[in-house]
Regions:
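Active-site helix of classical SDR
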Residues: 1, 37, 45
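A short helix-coil junction within the Rossmann-fold of NAD(P)-dependent oxidoreductases
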Residues: 3-15
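Short, flexible catalytic-loop segment of classical short-chain dehydrogenase/reductase
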Residues: 25, 42, 63-74
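Residue(s) in the substrate-gating loop at a strand-loop-helix junction
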Residues: 21
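Active-site loop immediately N-terminal to the catalytic Tyr-X3-Lys motif
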Residues: 26-32, 54-55, 91, 109
Length: 128
């Protein structure tokens, strides 16, 4: 991020989208080190957004929840995935496309007044 910020500062604009996690906003038993690392990404995102906002640089983070990826398939047995989905207000797991659409919006002019945001893409999981 440091080198990107130098280039963007010279240009007077830019967008940085960090990849955090739903666990940047909440906790999960047994995931202490992962949670700590993702809280750090969230803090870095917010702090850097404040420092570089006047330079025309927007910095946000996407906080995906449980997304249907190879990692989820490897780490969560199939029979547990349905139960996991049922614990989401939207009653499903996310898709990589859900995350990509959020990134596209954050990178677009439609979000021109959005910076320092930890943008949840988690089907409401962190809302409960």
């Amino acid at each position: 991020m440091r080198e990107s910020l130098k280039i963007m500062s010279s240009a007077g604009s830019g967008h940085i989208i960090n990849m955090a996690s739903a666990l940047s906003k909440t906790t999960f038993p047994g995931a202490g080190l992962y949670v700590a690392s993702k809280f750090a990404v969230g803090g870095l995102t917010r702090n850097t957004a404040v420092e570089y906002g006047q330079s025309g640089i927007r910095i946000n983070a996407i906080c995906p929840g449980f997304i249907k990826t190879p990692l989820l398939r490897e780490s969560v047995p199939e029979e547990d995935r349905a139960h996991l989905a049922s614990r989401h207000p939207m009653n499903r797991l996310g898709t990589p496309e859900d995350v990509a659409k959020a990134a596209m919006w954050l990178a677009s002019d439609a979000s021109s007044f959005v910076t320092g945001m930890l943008f949840s893409v988690d089907g409401g999981w962190t809302a409960i």
